[in-house]
Amino acid sequence: MTDPLSRAGLVIVDKPAGMTSHDVVSRCRRIFSTRKVGHAGTLDPMATGVLVIGIERATKIMGLLTLTTKSYAATIRFGQSTSTDDAEGEVLQTISASHLTEVDIEAAVAGLRGDIAQVPSSVSAIKVDGQRAYKLAREGQSVELAARPVRISRFDVLAVRGSGEDLIDVDVEIDCSSGTYIRALARDAGAALGVGGHLTALRRTRVGDFGLDRARTLEELADGATLTLDLDSACRQGFPRRDLDAAEVDAVRNGRPLAPAGIEGTYAAVDADDRVIALLADKGSRTTSVVVLRPANL
């Protein structure tokens, strides 16, 4: 019998510039001939790179996967600040950056490494009074967002070069926690240097365990709609494992709890055929089902 979950899994897409993350979801719906498609970790339209897409029943695990670390390659332009903190916004101010040295730039970058409190860009998806901040900002309303803790574990300067008479472009690589706004790092580094700054290029190179080496373009997927990881492989890779006997499999498929496993957090409950039956979590003296992937009625 054909496994009903054979079409479910993860696809790692190399998002092109000019498309929203939802645009990519829409394309994947057509490519994989299903409405059940979702994504984890939004990328701005100007950005390219790794976007994790869930197909069919894999959409149920997207919020559970550990995708808390991200890596980027970016270019920051010093000497101009913009309304969006990137190249798509209106230039608000231009101040000559020609006097800046590599030592100056490294000092500004160093001040943004480690655990910091970051004020997100006003043009962001954060909700303010029930509305997205970017919507309010584009309507001309003043948006004030609270600082939030983020971790910048790597912020390396790769190259410094002139861009015109007064501007300087700096290529950087960044490893950071989920929720970090790279545009805000560009803004804050420019502010620290007293000349303003904004992002001119952004490429996400890694999300969690998924890097560009596993990513495929939409054109490649259109030529062959294959999963990067099927649902079982994604769960076995993304969560601790608990092996079940036949009686335990029957219990889980029918919504009955098991004795706790002593495993911290969410874990994959796997049958003798290496299929993931459910994602479970211990709760006191029993398990609770986080999501049952293969219920009895499937």
Curated annotation (Swiss-Prot):
InterPro entries, sorted: PsdUridine_synth_cat_dom_sf, PsdUridine_synth_N, PUA-like_sf, PUA_sf, tRNA_psdUridine_synth_fam2_C, tRNA_psdUridine_synth_TruB, TruB_C
GO molecular function, a single term: RNA binding
Top-rank taxon, per record: Bacteria
One of the GO biological process terms: mRNA pseudouridine synthesis
Active site per the UniProt annotation: 44 (nucleophile)
Pfam hit, one: TruB_C
TM regions (residue ranges): none
Keyword Iron-sulfur: no
Catalytic activity: uridine(55) in tRNA = pseudouridine(55) in tRNA
Enzyme Commission number, as recorded: 5.4.99.25
Class of the enzyme per the UniProt entry, highest EC level: isomerase
Alphabetic keyword roster: Isomerase, tRNA processing
Similarity-based family: Belongs to the pseudouridine synthase TruB family. Type 1 subfamily.
Role summary: Responsible for synthesis of pseudouridine from uracil-55 in the psi GC loop of transfer RNAs.
Protein name in the entry: tRNA pseudouridine synthase B
Species assigned in the record: Mycobacteroides abscessus (strain ATCC 19977 / DSM 44196 / CCUG 20993 / CIP 104536 / JCM 13569 / NCTC 13031 / TMC 1543 / L948)
